[in-house]
């Protein structure tokens, strides 16, 4: 069992999954080359191989369901290539079935031998899969009524889709014994540390350009008194600097205005006035009109902000090294330009080398850690959550976790 907030989530170890027929919901949704239709990244596909191997080890037969893209989009393609890649990573043949609930798919599922694995076609070919509704409603959907009688258990390994409330994600737990897969378990276990008050001090390093999303996270952290310090970078830091009454110079104010962020200043000021432990950079790396880069104090900026400065790096790093939990979401600077990656790289390195447990929101951030640094997987978690991670940090309920908890309540008789 995993406990997160007030939810109890069963894991595959809590179900007697031995020689059973298991429906496994995974999330292999991957970026696709528009010209060739080929997958550009298979990291999500590879991640799920662990859960499949564990279920096969116990003699279970597995039917995989997942989605890829949305109808009408360039990345809305078949799951055939996904099944081939999964076969490679699992080390066993995974048969692709070009059907979902038709007679062909039903026959294949019924005839599946122990330790056999098949993958059904893109679940979003079914129009009802695009409907967002409560688990109780989806439990009565055609998909669930058609497939659930064919299985002994349902396992959901799709944390990256946990913010969706669609039939294949939340409908089955009300009609089948259900549990979280290993990918889901790792994600939820890691994130549960964020709201565990014993794991303190907690440092949140929040940057990037998604300012409105980040403000929601900060508001939730303030409400629940979770963060000991919130270290800001990127446009988030610029917004809080303005909210503090600091003049960032005409160019930087223009950037904030062009992005429509000045309207958020009163909201940011309210957070500062609440006494929230929000830190802003004391210096920045800026780009001048002649493309020269300089380090300038926050109180006297001439150039355009591109990264946090050395003094800020040292200050932020000292906070990070004293923490028990570090959550990093969003870069400190314009990382698309090699010249402005230093702040993000330095803080990532401090976190990974420090004593605390590290949660990195967004796999792209991990690529900036120096390759010479040994990453201890027991203390560093790279979340694949995306939208689910954002909503979790912002205090929103995740329908997939709610449905798995509901399954546990129904089957255990507890609440």
Curated annotation (Swiss-Prot):
Example GO BP: glycolytic process
Domain of life of the native organism: Archaea
InterPro entries the record matches: Phosphoglycerate_kinase, Phosphoglycerate_kinase_CS, Phosphoglycerate_kinase_N, Phosphoglycerate_kinase_sf
Pathway: Carbohydrate degradation; glycolysis; pyruvate from D-glyceraldehyde 3-phosphate: step 2/5
The gene coding this protein: pgk
Keywords: ATP-binding, Cytoplasm, Glycolysis, Kinase, Nucleotide-binding, Transferase
A cellular component annotation (GO) from this entry: cytosol
Protein's name in the database: Phosphoglycerate kinase
Keyword Kinase attributed: yes
């Amino acid at each position: 069992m995993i406990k997160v907030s007030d939810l109890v989530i069963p894991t595959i170890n809590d179900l007697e999954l031995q020689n059973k027929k298991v429906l496994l919901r995974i999330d292999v949704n991957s970026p696709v080359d528009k010209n060739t239709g080929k997958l550009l990244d298979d990291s999500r596909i590879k991640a799920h191989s662990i859960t499949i191997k564990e279920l096969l080890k116990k003699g279970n037969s597995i039917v995989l369901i997942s989605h890829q893209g949305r109808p009408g989009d360039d990345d809305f393609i078949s799951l055939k290539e996904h099944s081939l890649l999964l076969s490679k990573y699992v080390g066993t043949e995974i048969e692709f079935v070009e059907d979902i609930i038709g007679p062909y798919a039903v026959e294949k599922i019924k005839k599946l031998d122990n330790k056999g694995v098949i993958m059904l076609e893109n679940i979003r070919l079914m129009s009802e899969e695009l409907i967002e509704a409560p688990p109780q409603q989806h439990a009565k959907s055609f998909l669930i009524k058609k497939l659930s009688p064919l299985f002994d258990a349902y396992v959901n390994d799709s944390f990256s889709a946990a913010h969706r409330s669609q039939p294949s994600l939340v409908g089955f737990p009300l009609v089948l014994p259900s549990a979280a897969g290993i990918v889901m378990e790792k994600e939820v276990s890691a994130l549960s540390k964020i709201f565990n008050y014993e794991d303190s001090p907690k440092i949140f390093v929040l940057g990037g350009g998604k300012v409105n999303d980040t403000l929601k996270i900060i508001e939730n952290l303030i409400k629940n008194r979770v963060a000991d310090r919130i270290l800001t970078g990127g446009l988030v830091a610029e917004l809080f600097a303005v909210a503090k009454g600091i003049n960032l110079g005409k160019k930087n104010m223009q950037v904030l205005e062009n992005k429509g962020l000045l309207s958020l200043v009163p909201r940011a000021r309210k957070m500062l006035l609440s006494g929230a432990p929000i830190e802003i950079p004391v210096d920045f790396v800026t780009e001048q009109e002649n493309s020269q880069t300089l380090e300038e104090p926050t109180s006297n900026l001439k150039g355009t902000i591109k990264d946090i400065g050395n003094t800020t790096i040292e200050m932020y790093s000292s906070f990070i090294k004293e923490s028990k939990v570090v959550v990093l979401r969003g870069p400190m600077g314009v990382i698309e330009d090699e010249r402005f990656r230093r702040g993000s790289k330095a803080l990532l390195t401090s976190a990974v080398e420090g004593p605390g447990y590290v949660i990195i929101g967004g796999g792209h951030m991990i690529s900036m850690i120096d390759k010479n640094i040994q990453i201890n997987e027991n203390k560093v978690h790279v979340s694949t959550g995306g939208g689910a991670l954002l909503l979790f940090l912002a205090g929103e309920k995740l329908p997939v976790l709610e449905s798995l908890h509901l399954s546990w309540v129904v089957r255990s008789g507890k609440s």
